[in-house]
From Swiss-Prot:
Similarity-based family: Belongs to the universal ribosomal protein uS19 family.
Organism (species): Staurastrum punctulatum
Keywords (A to Z) from UniProt: Chloroplast, Plastid, Ribonucleoprotein, Ribosomal protein, RNA-binding, rRNA-binding
Primary localization: plastid
Gene3D superfamilies: 30s Ribosomal Protein S19, Chain A
Transmembrane listed as a keyword: no
Compartment(s) where it occurs, according to its Swiss-Prot or TrEMBL record: Plastid, Chloroplast
Any GO MF annotation of the entry: structural constituent of ribosome
PANTHER family: RIBOSOMAL PROTEIN S19P FAMILY MEMBER (PTHR11880), SMALL RIBOSOMAL SUBUNIT PROTEIN US19M (PTHR11880:SF8)
Keyword Chloroplast: yes
UniProt name for this protein: Small ribosomal subunit protein uS19c
Function noted in UniProt: Protein S19 forms a complex with S13 that binds strongly to the 16S ribosomal RNA.
Gene Ontology biological process: ribosomal small subunit assembly; translation
Length: 92
């Protein structure tokens, strides 16, 4: 079920404070966060946010098309190694 509109989007407080302070100073620094559940708001456009995927922080550059999505959507947590090739020679 979707979040109620009267509540507004969830953005972690510490992340919102960092974004607002960087916007006030006019700086563009990489912001490290573990908050994958935070929703991207228009104030984040143009910033690079390093989102934790369980092992490392992956840098994500925020564009206008990402607004409304969650930060965790852009930092995959699982590595796909590929399916095993069908080796018919070894079966015989």
């Amino acid at each position: 079920m979707a979040r109620s509109l009267k509540k507004g989007p969830f953005v972690a407080d510490h992340l919102l404070k960092k974004i607002e302070s960087l916007n006030a100073q006019g700086e563009k620094k990489v912001i490290i966060t573990w908050s994958r559940a935070s929703i991207i708001v228009p104030g984040m456009i143009g910033h690079t946010i390093a989102v934790h995927n369980g092992r490392e922080h992956l840098p994500v550059y925020i564009t206008d098309l990402m607004v409304g999505h969650k930060l965790g959507e852009f930092a995959p947590t699982r590595t796909f190694r590929g399916h095993a090739k069908s080796d018919k020679k070894s079966r015989r």
